Amino acid sequence: IRDRLRSTNSLWASYKIIEGLTIKETISYDFIDNQSTTYWPMNSNNGEAYNGLMIKYPYQHHNIYSSTVLNYTNTFADKHNLDVLLGWDVDDRKEQFVQAVGANYPHDKLPELGNTSEPMTASSGYSEDHLLSLLSRINYDYDDKYYISANYRRDGSSRLGAVSYTHL
């Protein structure tokens, strides 16, 4: 038996602050709930040696992403074009699971872990990580002939330790 639910949602809004300056916010949420149960009956190839065998594996995943971007564009004296972007992204992820295995069931009609006389293994796990990014870009051109561009991005990740994330 496998029940799986996945929900992916995204929402964005943009607002013109003044002429040439806009802000855009994007928020996304991804959720997975997976409930997996496998039972091999007593007379099956996999279950015969264990007098019935069951594995349960519930798993959940949460991911929240947010992006905020300020963008400024302007043309000066009909020949100087400027485009400046400043933004930051936040990405938070959490996952958790439990796995339990049981064997030696009294009857095939009672395939629940609480009915086993021989719990074999149980394990669980939890992970969480965060990513924070700062980004910027400046584009300039003169009369659509001469271009210059500069970009900067800095990422801080909890996967690389507290110093990487907090000293962004």
Could you tell me what each predicted segment is?
Residues S158-V163:
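Solvent-exposed loop/turn segments connecting transmembrane beta-strands
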Residues T166-H167:
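Conserved small/polar residues in nucleotide/adenosyl-binding loops
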Residues I1, T37-M54, K94-A122:
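Surface-exposed loop/turn segments flanking beta-strands in extracellular/periplasmic regions
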Residues I1-T38, I55-T75, D83, E95-F97, ...:
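Outer-membrane beta-barrel transmembrane strands
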Residues I18-E19, H107-L110, S157:
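Generic secondary-structure boundary/loop-capping signal
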Residues D83-D89:
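Extended hydrophobic secondary-structure segments that form protein cores and membrane-embedded regions
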Residues K79:
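Catalytic core regions of nucleotide second-messenger enzymes
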